[in-house]
């Protein structure tokens, strides 16, 4: 396959370099990744300033570029400019830390893959589910075996897979739902060396989803979480309920 690889941790991160090395053994790999850390940039794109791109070396078998853009920018550039719209798979990662629950709305990693899905290209975001001790090697090995096993043609149009890999022994993988995992934010007030006040965002994770088949619960049990997601955010159940009440009011 012709694979477009990106991330949000930057072109020099261990996760993307290792994944490029593994994937290039069996596939034609093109890397287009940010030139610096772009975590939590969500699905932002660059429209008011130029995008710069520079060819870099990762290995003899990989074509690689760094850009001044976001992960979504990288996929747009890779698809339209570098790979001339001939892409079989978009992979974003390997992220340092999990992308589960409401994380996915902030995640540059997920947004890189979602950009591919919005082009109707099979796309995967992959994360090692530990920020402190990520296992990039284990996540890379899992993805290689998963690609041999999983039939990407079964994905609905405009749908991607969000994969979170536990650290340590992997018992297998399970199809999951996005959880309601979220953060309770608070801000620490600090004083700069110039005597000016600034704020540093902190947070405590909330994991109170009692459903068994959600992403973080499966990862906590030692399984890889594989969640199909798409960019269409309409709450269909709520829409039906509201129409029952208000449809007559709008006629």
Curated annotation (Swiss-Prot):
Cofactor binding note: Binds 1 divalent metal cation per subunit.
Reaction catalyzed: a ribonucleoside 5'-phosphate + H2O = a ribonucleoside + phosphate
Principal location class: cytoplasm
UniProt xrefs under Pfam families: SurE (PF01975)
Keyword entries, A-Z: Cytoplasm, Hydrolase, Metal-binding, Nucleotide-binding
Signal peptide residues on this chain, from the entry's feature table: none
E.C. number(s) listed in UniProt: 3.1.3.5
GO molecular function, one term: nucleotide binding
Database matches in InterPro entries: SurE, SurE-like_Pase/nucleotidase, SurE-like_sf
Keyword Hydrolase set for record: yes
SUPFAM superfamilies found in the cross-reference section: SurE-like
Any one Gene Ontology cellular component term annotated for this protein: cytoplasm
Cofactor dependence: a divalent metal cation
Residues reported to bind a divalent metal cation: 8-9, 39, 95
EC supergroup of this enzyme: hydrolase
Gene3D superfamilies listed in its UniProt record: Survival protein SurE-like phosphatase/nucleotidase
Locations listed in the record: Cytoplasm
Keyword Nucleotide-binding recorded: yes
Function in brief: Nucleotidase that shows phosphatase activity on nucleoside 5'-monophosphates.
Similarity comment: family membership: Belongs to the SurE nucleotidase family.
HAMAP family registered for this protein in UniProt: SurE (MF_00060)
Protein name in the entry: 5'-nucleotidase SurE
């Amino acid at each position: 396959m012709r694979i477009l690889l990106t991330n949000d941790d930057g072109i020099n991160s261990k996760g993307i370099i290792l994944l490029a090395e593994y994937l290039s053994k069996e596939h034609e790999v093109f890397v287009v990744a940010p030139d610096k850390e772009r975590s939590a940039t969500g699905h932002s794109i660059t429209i008011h300033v130029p995008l710069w791109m520079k060819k870099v070396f990762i290995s003899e078998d990989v074509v690689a570029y760094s850009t001044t853009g976001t992960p979504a920018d990288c996929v747009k550039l890779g698809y339209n400019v570098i790979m001339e719209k001939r892409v079989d798979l978009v992979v974003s990662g390997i992220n340092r830390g999990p992308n589960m629950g409401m994380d996915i709305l902030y995640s540059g990693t997920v947004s890189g893959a979602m950009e591919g899905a919005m082009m109707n290209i099979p796309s995967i975001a992959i994360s090692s589910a530990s920020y402190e001790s990520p296992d990039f090697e284990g996540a890379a090995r899992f993805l290689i075996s998963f690609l041999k096993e999983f039939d990407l043609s079964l994905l609905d149009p405009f749908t991607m897979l969000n994969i979170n890999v536990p650290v340590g022994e992997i018992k297998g993988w399970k199809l999951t739902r996005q959880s309601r995992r979220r953060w309770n934010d608070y801000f620490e007030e600090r004083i700069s060396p110039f005597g000016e006040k600034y704020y540093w965002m902190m947070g405590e994770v909330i994991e109170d989803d009692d459903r068994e088949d959600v992403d973080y619960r499966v990862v906590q049990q030692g399984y890889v979480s594989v969640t199909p997601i798409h960019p269409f955010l309409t709450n269909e159940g709520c829409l039906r309920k509201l129409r029952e009440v208000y449809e007559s009011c709008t006629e």
